[in-house]
From Swiss-Prot:
This is Protein-methionine-sulfoxide reductase heme-binding subunit MsrQ. Its cofactor is FMN; heme b. Its main location: membrane. It comes from Shigella flexneri serotype 5b (strain 8401). It holds the Pfam family Ferric_reduct. The gene is msrQ. The chain crosses the membrane at residues 8-28, 54-74, 82-102, 116-136, 153-173, 178-198. Heterodimer of a catalytic subunit (MsrP) and a heme-binding subunit (MsrQ).
Amino acid sequence: MRLTAKQVIWLKVCLHLAGLLPFLWLVWAINHGGLGADPVKDIQHFTGRTALKFLLAALLITPLARYAKQPLLIRTRRLLGLWCFACATLHLTSYALLELGVNNLPLLGKELITRPYLTLGIISWVILLALAFTSTQSMQRKLGKHWQQLHNFVYLVAILAPIHYLWSVKIISPQPLIYAGLAVLLLALRYKKLLSLFNRLRKQAHNKLSL
């Protein structure tokens, strides 16, 4: 039985409510001592992990819709992507304001360049910013065929973000490895598309070098 448009709307409502839960928990934890000995790091890691969860959920939608034969499920992908961007923005903001501090914000650019894991993080965030800004139907119509080309960069984020997480922790624990493994699995489900994209980029690069 396929989902109806009305059921998808209710599913979106449920997903938005689910998206609010991590923020509500974080507010509660901050106000009731629910964080650890280093609350700043806890906030950074929590927002970063939540962004990764939404990213992985968004990547899961397409194969899930295909295998479950639920085409309308695709309509939930955008809101998951926007929640991912919101969490990633909080993640970046918590680093800039809570760890560096307002007085040290001029150092942010230097930090992003000199620390490789931060470089991967900011590249991922910039891509997510572009995807969020162009996620509307009006932007899709305006960009035409270039819209899909731009949104294919989500696969690059799926590679860079788990590496950013792995690189940022001092001691490798199972958690970042699990996220990395899930990202690899979801990318493997799209291997045909990724292989096609790779071959197209290689062909374009070859043509440019031949000029």
